[in-house]
């Protein structure tokens, strides 16, 4: 009987120990389950962040592509402005050559006027010395009149040429104004593009890269942005150079216009002198 009691007590103790071990095992399983749930939650959060990072990188790549396209458009506009400035330079060269030819014609007209004046003086002297030789005086007067008419024709032709030069200069001035407007618009667009690039750069810098691949792609995009910034700076420099060229051309046009006004005044004076000489000869 005592042996049975001892055996039952031992079995009870073993049962209690087994229950304790079972409780400990259940607690351990519960803790491991909670830990596993936390790990799974962290994994889900990490996956969400990775997806957001990928989306941000795709968006940044799209923004960078748009910025590159805009920069190419601006560079194309700058090249067009430079080509237009070169064309204006060629036109200015042609106008200067035409002005030189007009000055040569003016010199010829001036020489004709001097010759006519000299002939008139000679005719006056001869008239006073030999009043009885009216026929010869009349012939000299006719010669002077012919020379005066020829000088007038030359002056009129030169005047027409100068009017044509003035018209062309007005067209060049209008082209220069349009070129300046395009250069200014290009500068404004470049400023806007620079702001867009700055925003893209800030977005790239603010991305949280969680793995090595994302970090490498961000470095690549930042390198592209630096390249685009360098190209943008070059485009701004070229735009500034084009604007300075336009300003120089404008000054040159102003100078040519002043010369035209001066030459027209000289033509006017020559015409008045010719008219006066003709009137004096007609009075004889």
UniProtKB/Swiss-Prot annotation:
Pfam families cross-referenced by the UniProt entry: Tropomyosin
Coiled coil: 1-284
UniProt keyword annotation of Repeat present: yes
Positions of the UniProt region annotated as Disordered: 112-148
UniProt cross-references to PROSITE patterns, sorted A to Z: TROPOMYOSIN
Functional note: Tropomyosin, in association with the troponin complex, plays a central role in the calcium dependent regulation of muscle contraction.
Family statement drawn from the similarity comment of this UniProt entry: Belongs to the tropomyosin family.
Name of this chain's protein: Tropomyosin
Gene name linked to the record: tmy-1
């Amino acid at each position: 009987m005592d042996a049975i009691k001892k055996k039952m007590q031992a079995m009870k103790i073993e049962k209690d120990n087994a229950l304790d071990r079972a409780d400990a095992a259940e607690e351990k399983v519960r803790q491991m389950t909670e830990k596993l749930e936390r790990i799974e939650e962290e994994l889900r959060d990490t996956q969400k962040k990775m997806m957001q990072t990928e989306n941000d990188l795709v968006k940044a790549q799209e923004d960078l592509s748009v910025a590159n396209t805009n920069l190419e458009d601006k560079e194309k506009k700058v090249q067009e402005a430079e080509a237009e400035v070169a064309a204006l330079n060629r036109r200015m060269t042609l106008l200067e050559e035409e002005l030189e030819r007009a000055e040569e014609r003016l010199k010829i007209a001036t020489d004709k006027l001097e010759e006519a004046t000299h002939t008139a003086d000679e005719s006056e002297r001869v008239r006073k010395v030999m009043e009885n030789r009216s026929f010869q005086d009349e012939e000299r007067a006719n010669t002077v009149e012919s020379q005066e008419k020829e000088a007038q024709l030359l002056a009129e032709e030169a005047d027409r040429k100068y009017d044509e030069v003035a018209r062309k200069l007005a067209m060049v001035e209008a082209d220069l104004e349009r070129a300046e407007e395009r250069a200014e618009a290009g500068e404004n667009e470049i400023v806007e593009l620079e702001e867009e690039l700055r925003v893209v750069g800030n977005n790239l810098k603010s991305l949280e890269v969680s793995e090595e691949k994302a970090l490498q792609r961000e470095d690549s995009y930042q390198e592209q942005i630096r390249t685009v910034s360098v190209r943008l700076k070059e485009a701004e420099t070229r735009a500034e150079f084009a604007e300075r060229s336009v300003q120089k051309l404008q000054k040159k046009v102003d100078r040519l216009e002043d010369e035209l006004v001066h030459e027209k005044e000289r033509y006017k004076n020559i015409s008045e002198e010719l008219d006066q000489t003709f009137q004096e000869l007609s009075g004889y």
